[in-house]
Amino acid sequence: MENLKATELRLGLPGTEEEAAPPPSTPRAGSKRALAGEPDQAKIKPAAAAKAQVVGWPPVRSYRKSCLQPTTTTTKSKPPPAAAAAETQQKEDVAGAGGLFVKVSMDGAPYLRKIDLKVYKGYRELREALEAMFLCFSGGAAADAAVNPSDFAVTYEDKDGDLMLVGDVPFEMFISTCKRLRIMKGSEARGLGATRG
């Protein structure tokens, strides 16, 4: 009999040794379910305390953890004060050595893309990459022949949230202030300044 209890399947909580109460013979009037009598309430033990949150939950992939940790070069001895400025510049270069990814959206395109601005050396390379990325929407061979890539203006949102035309400021300043790129129809960008082809 003891062997059967070890493999018995029941609906009770694990670790409880209570016997299941037999169902009542007559259901109480006005209730949807028949409940066991009041004496059975004394047999119920208090519920176990809620478990603490598991360490490491929710899971974060290792590459995300390494991206969040700053990458700096550490030295054992303190550098002289004259080299402090050069070291801070080197730390900024190391910290900025990763990519500078921004979202790119296009009017009429059903999806967004992300690009790394540090890959491009100037506005021309950036515009060519954007045209290749959104080829089917900006007048590629598969799109309508009436659509011309020059009908679109490339704009960006800077740190202040202002919408500016790409090409109005030097490229290095553009890279440092750009938060988001948007390819909009030229007719909508007329108020921003002269469109560039």
Swiss-Prot record:
Q: Where is this motif: EAR-like (transcriptional repression)?
A: 9-13
Q: Tell me the keywords, alphabetical order.
A: Auxin signaling pathway, Nucleus, Repressor, Transcription, Transcription regulation
Entry's localization field: Nucleus
Region: Disordered; residue ranges are 1-43, 66-90
Q: Which organism is it from?
A: Oryza sativa subsp. japonica (Rice)
Which tissues carry this protein?
Highly expressed in etiolated seedlings. Expressed in roots.
Please state the protein's primary subcellular location: nucleus
Induction, as annotated: By auxin.
Q: Where, if anywhere, are coiled coils annotated?
A: none
* Name assigned to this protein: Auxin-responsive protein IAA31
User: How does the record describe its quaternary structure?
Assistant: Homodimers and heterodimers.
